């Protein structure tokens, strides 16, 4: 695999195990400070380790998802009750002095800010400690966090089984709540499984086995996507796969082609048989070595079929390289829980950051106020709250190594201008951290030029301090007096101002009264700014009003220098930044704590290279770092090979938003600090990336960013010699249980990496009101060339149609497996979600240029290639002489690399992605080339930037939400009208039938007397004929009256349907026009974005050309720079003109496509109107016959049993049967067409 370590990694991860004590349960008193409640409960954990559960006072089972537990604490770190009543009940103040050891606090929550504290007190001694340790192990288990799809479904089943009511039964309402997106669908699935489905009912646990639950899920969430996969891989209509088909599928589709076949051999028949035995539920299929669709579905969700290999999750990289060789998980302003101006500071944030894998936290320390004079942490010159430094250090000592044993860096931003309080800070560090605090450098790594930094392995369990260091200059130095004099003057002025004002908080400014001469860090140091400068801008009104709050511009300037020394360039303007614009100088006590992380002011990469001190590091605000990244990217990479660099957000991010960390990982910056309290895409990417390598907080940088003999340009667009590029295709097939609402869902696929590798906002269409089991199965998203896969990450995220976040997953590109896989989604804080998942298909492989594909195929299957050569030789022998054939064979063998013919694919299984066109590779010209690009290359550049915008097809617009709502309303209106007509028709029919029956009875009575004598037979016959004639005329009148009513009703329905059709056509036309307007707006935005992107590419090429020119002959440098600028202007003008021409052509194509859609709509309108008129006419023509048949029937007595007669006899309106329902179905079909 690209970027993998040689050999097979020995997996160290272990699955979660629940000890007997937790399964059996223990007695605790659960107490709550807010409600003053305390209840005796029995805590238990289910055998799988999914949930912590207990029975509350209402006899309902409460559960806590163990994966949401962020920490467990006992002893002095657990929360103590403050309520006197609770303290009395728990026994505090009594003779038992070991009560603290019985306390346990469970911290849980969806993110580090919104945490919930559950407080327990064990009844027996030592119970709390066992529970705290075991619960924490379960919560932090990496395999549990990355469980298979089947495991998460089993987890949902376990929750339902645990949450029983007082009778020990499973309430149906809990099932409806778990699958709340479509409750009707849930009820139908429960009923089809023979289970109770009424909300008020409950189910016996023995009736709800795991097999029944799986059957319920299959009924609830139909899977046509898996049926299609089975068909594609060779089932061919059969409901099963044979052993050979399954083995071929796993070896050809599910196998990573980048793996070595010796170290990772293909699946053998015996192994495939074991998979069938594990996943196939049907015994008959099992006996025949076959896998059914249900067994295949289980296999896809099994642990063997994860999207990532387990070694990617394990601690699998070399941890013995210098610290500078790693990306280190870092936090900025760790104490804040919200914004930068008025947010709340919290000690808990330090715990949560460290537990989340952060290895570098920031401490902004300020001088404490009398009388305590305790240093505290806050964000200076803002209204953020304060927390004591001592509490923070104790929290760090408690949690520093609970999730990772590797070193923690304390990044001090020191504003304590009191020698006494700085000494107190140092003493706190020594006493609280003890032996964990690294004070003296390691013997193997002295603080000397050229000596590399120690490794994370060397520093395991150690805490390092980053703080300005005090250096004493040599006594006989030539410029010592020159340095000392201005500093002494500055210090005397500061001392006088300190004596006059005695400020003690950052809100009023903190003068550097303890600044001492000679604090140079080996570099020239400028004068301190007058300490009371910020007060000039306050005025009396500002002082009376309260704390001085900086504006965004001031904050950016302040943050820009927060960890650097003062600017020494007198030409640069100064600003009123307050004392927080620079740290105060360190005293001797704090300086002795600094060793391998010594901050210095950054001057240039050349100066740092000459000093060659690996233990010196510099901090960059993101804007300055971007400037260096843009101007000198390769030098930045070289700097980060030896020394550490820390990047932090600019001060204008007052909302605590984050920059994209990938920008600075690309140049090898180690300490890329982010605001952990803001879970935006940048923080989500950070959390996802640092999940790997055992969540150690350290990720080894790619080899080219570490080796001193290799140079690396992060802006390269070509394959780098020695780095195996990758190709990746991702097809989003379907989703399952993505939301608890009945809404549309869409999926975005992004790639983050080098600029050439980064792709944003690939997106599927939005499903139509289906969040249970949407199926997309669209064209794949293609990433044809990933230049540096070990630094690239894939993000797959699902959203509701309104843009609400559903879940996402961050995957390292170099570890993604090929084939069909479930991606179980995570929340913003990277915690696993139980039910939401996506089924995707991936093709991951080593990148091969198109002109080398034939060579690659020959190397993959050399036997087939040689056989093809032999076959060609034999064919030649039949046409020419034997001797010439031999010569031709030799020639063929000599030139086979140039004459490789087209070969049939060695893979007999068709790919679901074969139908999609392959994206052409990007331009192969180096952006650093100083020659003007050829027209063909420039056209490739335009094509790579330009995105196509196609008009929305009419069929897709018919599914628009507005049209769906209109159709629903029209169908409801038509149903109401028909019900009204049916009632009238049934009433009239009943009256007519009664009249016919009465008339017939009267006629028989009149004829009956004549039947007693035989003398008047002729007269009786005549009377009978007259009676029959009168009866027939009466019948005709009855039929005619019903016919007139039905004709009027049919005409009314026809008129209503015509109105509906015209409304629907009008609404469809409006939808088309709205879609066209939206596309034009989007096209305009795309035009601007493409122009900016083109300009960025051209500017980057110019910068690279200038950099190359500077490294060549200095005498020709000026002339060459002038020529580069001239060519840049010419190429920019020409490229923008070509881009505008291409954009105009794209606009014309879009207009033509939209006109075609409107023309299609215009052509369909008369057809639909004519079709409706014909349907109504035919329905009217059928009325006489239908009414006579319904009213009179075909019986000789004259009274039939047609639908209307039946309805009239039963006394209710007809349902879906009969002649009245035909128009209804026609209307539904007509609406479906729209």
UniProtKB/Swiss-Prot annotation:
Domain C2: 707-835
Record carries keyword Acetylation: yes
Signal peptide limits: none
PROSITE patterns assigned: C2, PIPLC_X_DOMAIN, PIPLC_Y_DOMAIN
Active-site feature positions: 332, 379
Family annotation (InterPro entries): C2_dom, C2_domain_sf, EF-hand-dom_pair, PI-PLC_fam, PLC-beta, PLC-beta_C, PLC-beta_C_sf, PLC-beta_PH
Any one cellular-component term (Gene Ontology): cytoplasm
UniProt note on regulation of activity: Activated by G(q)/G(11) G alpha proteins in response to ligand-binding to G protein-coupled receptors.
Sites bearing N-acetylalanine, chain numbering: 2
Keywords, comma-separated and alphabetical: Acetylation, Calcium, Cytoplasm, Dwarfism, Hydrolase, Lipid degradation, Lipid metabolism, Membrane, Nucleus, Phosphoprotein, Transducer
One Gene Ontology term of the molecular function aspect: phospholipase C activity
Span list, region Interaction with SHANK2: 1231-1234
Bias-annotated ranges (Polar residues): 576-587, 887-908
Pfam families: C2, PH_14, PI-PLC-X, PI-PLC-Y, PLC-beta_C, PLCB1-4-like_EFh
Medical condition linked: Spondylometaphyseal dysplasia with corneal dystrophy: An autosomal recessive disorder characterized by postnatal growth deficiency, profound limb shortening with proximal and distal segments involvement, narrow chest, radiological abnormalities involving the spine, pelvis and metaphyses, corneal clouding, and intellectual disability.
Subunit field text: Interacts with SHANK2. Interacts with LPAR2.
Descriptive protein name: 1-phosphatidylinositol 4,5-bisphosphate phosphodiesterase beta-3
Organism: Homo sapiens
């Amino acid at each position: 695999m690209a970027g993998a370590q040689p050999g097979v990694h020995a997996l160290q991860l272990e699955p979660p195990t629940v000890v007997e004590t937790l399964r059996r349960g223990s007695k605790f008193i659960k107490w709550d400070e807010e409600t003053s409640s305390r209840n005796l409960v029995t805590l238990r954990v289910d055998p799988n380790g999914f949930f912590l559960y207990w029975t509350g006072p209402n006899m309902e089972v409460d559960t806590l998802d163990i994966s949401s537990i962020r920490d467990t604490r006992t002893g002095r770190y657990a929360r103590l009750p403050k309520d006197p009543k609770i303290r009395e009940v728990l026994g505090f103040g009594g003779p038992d002095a070991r009560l603290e050891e019985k306390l346990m606090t469970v911290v849980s929550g969806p993110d580090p800010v919104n945490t919930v504290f559950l407080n327990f007190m064990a009844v027996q001694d030592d119970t709390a400690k066992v529970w705290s340790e075991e619960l924490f192990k379960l919560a932090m288990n990496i395999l549990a966090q990355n469980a298979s799809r089947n495991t998460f479904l089993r987890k949902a089943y376990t929750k339902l089984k645990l949450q029983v009511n007082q009778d020990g039964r499973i309430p149906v309402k809990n099932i409806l709540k778990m699958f709340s997106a479509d409750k009707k669908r849930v009820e139908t699935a429960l009923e089809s499984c023979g289970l109770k489905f009424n909300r008020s009912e409950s189910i016996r646990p023995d009736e709800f086995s795991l097999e029944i639950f799986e059957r319920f899920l299959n009924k609830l969430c139909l899977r046509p996507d898996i049926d299609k996969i089975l068909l594609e891989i060779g089932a061919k209509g059969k409901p099963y796969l044979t052993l050979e088909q399954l083995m071929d599928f796993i070896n050809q589709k599910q196998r990573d082609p980048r793996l070595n076949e010796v170290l990772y051999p293909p699946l053998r028949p015996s192994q495939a048989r074991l998979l069938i035995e594990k996943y196939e539920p049907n015994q008959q299929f099992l006996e025949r070595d076959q896998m059914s669709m249900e067994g295949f579905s289980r296999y896809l969700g099994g642990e063997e079929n994860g999207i990532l290999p387990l070694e990617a999750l394990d601690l699998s990289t070399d941890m013995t390289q210098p610290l500078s060789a790693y990306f280190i998980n870092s936090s900025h302003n760790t104490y804040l829980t919200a914004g930068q101006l008025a947010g709340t500071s919290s000690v808990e944030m330090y715990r949560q950051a460290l537990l989340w894998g952060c290895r570098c936290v920031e401490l902004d320390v300020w001088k404490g106020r009398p009388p305590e004079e305790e240093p505290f942490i806050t964000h200076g010159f803002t209204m953020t709250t304060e927390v004591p430094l001592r509490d923070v250090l104790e929290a760090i000592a408690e949690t520093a190594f609970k999730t990772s044993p590797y070193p923690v860096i304390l990044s001090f931003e020191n504003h304590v201008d009191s020698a006494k309080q700085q000494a107190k800070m140092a003493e706190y560090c020594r006493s609280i951290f003890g032996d964990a605090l690294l004070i003296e450098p390691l013997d193997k790594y002295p603080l000397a030029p050229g000596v590399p930094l120690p490794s994370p392995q060397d520093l395991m369990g150690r805490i390092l301090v980053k703080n300005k260091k005090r250096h004493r200059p040599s006594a006989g130095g030539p410029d010592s007096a020159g340095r000392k004099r201005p500093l002494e003057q500055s210090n005397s002025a500061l001392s006088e101002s300190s004596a006059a004002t005695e400020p003690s908080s950052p809100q009023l400014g903190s003068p550097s009264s303890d600044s001492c001469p000679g604090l140079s860090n080996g570099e020239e140091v400028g004068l301190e700014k007058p300490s009371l400068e910020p007060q000039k801008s306050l005025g009396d009104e500002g002082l009376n009003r309260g704390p001085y709050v900086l504006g965004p511009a001031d904050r950016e300037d302040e943050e820009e220098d927060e960890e650097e020394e003062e600017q020494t360039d007198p030409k640069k303007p100064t600003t009123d930044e307050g004392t927080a614009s620079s740290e105060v100088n360190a005293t001797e006590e704090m300086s002795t704590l600094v060793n391998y992380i010594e901050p210095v002011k950054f001057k240039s990469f050349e100066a740092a290279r000459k000093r060659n001190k690996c233990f010196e590091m510099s901090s960059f605000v993101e804007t300055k770092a971007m400037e260096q990244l843009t101007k000198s990217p390769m030098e930045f990479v070289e700097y980060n090979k030896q020394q550490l660099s820390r990047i932090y957000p600019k001060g204008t991010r007052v909302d605590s938003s984050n920059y994209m960390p990938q920008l600075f990982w690309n140049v090898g910056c180690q300490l890329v600090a982010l605001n952990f309290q803001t879970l935006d895409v940048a923080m989500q990417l950070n959390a996802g990336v640092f999940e790997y390598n055992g969540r150690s907080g350290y990720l080894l940088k790619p080899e080219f960013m570490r080796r001193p003999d290799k140079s690396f340009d992060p802006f390269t667009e070509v394959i780098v010699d020695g780095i195996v590029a990758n190709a990746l295709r991702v097809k989003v097939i379907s989703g399952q249980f993505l939301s608890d609402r009945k809404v549309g869902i869409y999926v975005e696929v992004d790639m983050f990496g080098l600029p050439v590798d980064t792709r944003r906002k690939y997106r599927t269409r939005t499903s139509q009101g289906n969040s249970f089991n949407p199926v997309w199965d669209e064209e794949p998203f293609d990433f044809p060339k990933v230049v540096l896969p070990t630094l690239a990450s894939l993000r797959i995220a699902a959203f509701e149609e309104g843009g609400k976040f559903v879940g996402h997953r961050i995957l390292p590109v170099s570890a993604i497996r090929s084939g069909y896989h479930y991606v179980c989604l995570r929340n913003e804080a990277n915690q696993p979600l139980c039910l939401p998942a996506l089924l995707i298909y991936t093709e991951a492989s080593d990148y091969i240029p198109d002109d080398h594909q034939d060579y690659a195929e020959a190397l993959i299957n050399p036997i087939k290639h040689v056989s093809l050569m032999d076959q060609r030789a034999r064919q030649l022998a039949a046409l020419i002489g034997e001797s010439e054939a031999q010569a031709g064979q030799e020639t063929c063998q000599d030139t086979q690399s140039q004459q490789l013919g087209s070969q049939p694919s060695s893979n007999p299984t068709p790919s679901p992605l074969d139908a999609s066109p392959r994206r052409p590779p990007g331009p192969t010209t180096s952006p650093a080339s100083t020659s003007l690009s050829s027209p063909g290359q420039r056209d490739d550049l335009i094509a790579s930037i330009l995105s196509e915008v196609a008009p929305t097809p009419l069929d897709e617009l018919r599914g628009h939400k507005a049209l769906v709502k209109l159709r629903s309303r029209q169908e409801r209106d038509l149903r109401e009208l028909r019900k009204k007509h049916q009632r009238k028709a049934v009433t009239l029919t009943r009256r007519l039938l009664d009249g016919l029956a009465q008339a017939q009875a009267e006629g028989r009575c009149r004829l009956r007397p004549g039947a007693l004598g035989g003398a008047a037979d002729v007269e009786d016959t005549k009377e009978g004929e007259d009676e029959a004639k009168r009866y027939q005329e009466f019948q005709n009148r009855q039929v005619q009256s019903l016919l007139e009513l039905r004709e009027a009703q049919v005409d009314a329905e026809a008129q209503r349907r015509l109105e509906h059709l015209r409304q629907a056509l009008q609404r469809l036309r409006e939808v088309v026009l709205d879609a066209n307007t939206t596309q034009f707006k989007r096209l305009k935005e795309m035009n601007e974005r493409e122009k900016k992107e083109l300009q960025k590419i051209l500017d980057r090429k110019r910068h690279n050309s200038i950099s190359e020119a500077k490294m060549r002959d200095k005498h020709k440098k000026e002339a060459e720079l002038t020529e580069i600028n001239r060519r840049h202007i010419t190429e920019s003008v020409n490229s923008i003109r070509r881009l505008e021409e291409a954009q105009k052509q794209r606009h014309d194509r879009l207009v033509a496509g939209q006109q075609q859609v409107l023309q299609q709509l215009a052509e369909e309108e008369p057809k639909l109107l004519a079709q409706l008129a014909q349907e109504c006419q035919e329905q009217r023509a059928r009325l006489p016959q239908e009414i006579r048949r319904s009213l009179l029937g075909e019986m000789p007595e004259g009274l039939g049993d047609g639908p209307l007669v039946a309805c009239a006899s039963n006394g209710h309106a007809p349902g879906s049967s009969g002649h009245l329902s035909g128009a209804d179905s026609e209307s539904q079909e007509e609406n479906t067409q729209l």
